[in-house]
């Protein structure tokens, strides 16, 4: 009996992997064995960096809040402590947005928290 191969599925699988490597330079974009490694590594980086992105944004918000807080004469840690003690329900993302877009409102929040 002749050897039976499922060439339709094989070709589809290769095509799917090669499609993920679109735009890669040199053999990383067209040699299947190299493409597999390149795509695997790219997916590992993507997985890792989806988590790192969350950390980076939180860090950015904290930096912005700290800069605005220091302009109002208080450090970030003392401001956040005061906000938590006064039970002011505002997250860092919103607080950073207010600090950048509306400094007057941020100053009011600082004054409310510290009184």
Swiss-Prot record:
Family statement: Belongs to the bacterial ribosomal protein bL20 family.
UniProt keyword ATP-binding, yes or no: no
PROSITE patterns: RIBOSOMAL_L20
PANTHER family for the chain: 39S RIBOSOMAL PROTEIN L20
GO molecular function, one term: rRNA binding
Single GO cellular component term: ribosome
Organism taxonomic ancestry: Bacteria, Pseudomonadati, Chlorobiota, Chlorobiia, Chlorobiales
Keywords: Ribonucleoprotein, Ribosomal protein, RNA-binding, rRNA-binding
GO annotation, biological process: ribosomal large subunit assembly; translation
Protein function: Binds directly to 23S ribosomal RNA and is necessary for the in vitro assembly process of the 50S ribosomal subunit. It is not involved in the protein synthesizing functions of that subunit.
UniProt organism field: Chlorobaculum tepidum (strain ATCC 49652 / DSM 12025 / NBRC 103806 / TLS)
Name this polypeptide is given: Large ribosomal subunit protein bL20
SUPFAM superfamilies for the chain: Ribosomal protein L20 (SSF74731)
Keyword rRNA-binding set for record: yes
């Amino acid at each position: 009996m002749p050897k039976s191969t499922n060439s339709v599925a094989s070709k589809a699988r290769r095509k799917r992997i090669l499609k993920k490597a679109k735009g890669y330079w040199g053999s990383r974009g067209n040699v299947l064995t190299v493409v597999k490694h390149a795509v695997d590594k790219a997916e590992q980086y993507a997985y890792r960096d989806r988590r790192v992105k969350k950390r980076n944004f939180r860090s950015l918000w904290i930096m912005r809040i700290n800069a605005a807080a220091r302009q109002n004469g208080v450090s970030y840690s003392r401001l956040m402590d005061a906000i938590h003690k006064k039970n002011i329900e505002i997250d860092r993302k919103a607080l950073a947005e207010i600090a950048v877009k509306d400094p007057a409102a941020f100053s009011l929040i600082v004054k409310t928290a510290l009184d």
